[in-house]
Design a protein with these regions (language model features):
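C-terminal alpha-helical interaction appendages
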Residues: 1-53
Length: 53
């Protein structure tokens, strides 16, 4: 199930702007498609958002 930007706040408090929420969803969905691992996808998205914040 693909994530949306609305899902970002449930997984990281650092996605505080609409742009960061969109970035989180993009990274998480790309990682999920590539690896098929939801946990890894969330961790990767959280890491990218943390670096951008």
């Amino acid at each position: 199930m693909p994530w949306t930007s609305d899902d970002a706040e449930r997984h990281t408090h650092k996605a505080s702007t609409p742009e960061l929420k969109e970035l989180w969803a993009k990274v998480a969905n790309e990682s999920l498609e590539r690896d098929g691992d939801e946990g890894r996808a969330i961790r990767e998205a959280n890491g990218v958002v943390a670096r951008e914040a």
